[in-house]
Design a protein with these regions (language model features):
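Short beta->alpha transition motifs characteristic of CBS
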Residues: 39-46
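A short, polar/charged loop-to-alpha-helix boundary motif
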Residues: 48-58
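Immediate flanking context of iron-sulfur cluster ligation sites
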Residues: 70-82
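Small-residue (primarily alanine) positions within well-ordered alpha-helices
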Residues: 13, 17-20, 30, 40, ...
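Short beta-strand scaffold segments in enzyme catalytic cores
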Residues: 28-36
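Short, basic and Ser/Thr-rich N-terminal targeting/leader segments
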Residues: 24-28, 74
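Zinc-dependent deaminase
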Residues: 1-20, 84-151
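A short, polar/acidic, helix/strand-boundary loop motif
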Residues: 2, 46-47
Length: 151
């Protein structure tokens, strides 16, 4: 248990993950914050949308871009409960997200600190500031309990 309360955006991302779990999706949630205000929230929805790209990060980036009327999300923060995969990390770079906060590492599928390490490549034209670990215990417990219940 953390000595400090989680920042509100990570609480919101965890809430989105719980909504996804209730819908039968893998419990991963994400929010986009602009000027201290959550402007978009989403959870994984590949099953519901019959879309393998419907990761929480992809959906929330689309929502935020629509809300701002701009495909560039300069000055925005993305808060997500799990380390983004290569696809999502690429979308984060293309959207020009300024800061990425993720709760739990993903040694198998993550592509920020693990695997492809997308932001470390010369071909990556934008690199957000990256912060990890806030909310790790809660996000990891959600995922662990979800998969345990399905085995």
């Amino acid at each position: 248990m953390s000595r400090w309360p989680l920042p509100e955006p990570m609480q919101s991302a965890l809430d989105a993950a719980r909504r996804g779990e209730s819908a039968g999706e893998v419990p991963i949630g994400a929010v986009v914050v602009k000027d201290g205000v959550v402007i978009a929230a989403a959870h994984n929805a590949p099953r519901a949308l019959h879309d393998p790209t419907a990761h929480a990060e992809m959906l929330v980036i689309r929502q935020a871009a629509a809300a701002l009327g701009n495909e560039r999300l300069d000055g925005c923060e993305l808060w997500v409960t799990l380390e983004p995969c290569a696809m999502c990390a690429g979308a984060i770079a293309h959207a020009r997200i300024s800061r990425l906060y993720y709760a739990a590492p993903d040694p198998k599928g993550g592509a920020v600190e693990h695997g492809a390490r997308v932001f470390d490549h010369d071909q990556c034209l934008h690199r957000p500031e990256v912060y990890s670990g806030m909310g790790e215990a809660a996000a990891s417990a959600l995922l662990r309990d979800f998969f345990r219940s399905r085995r």
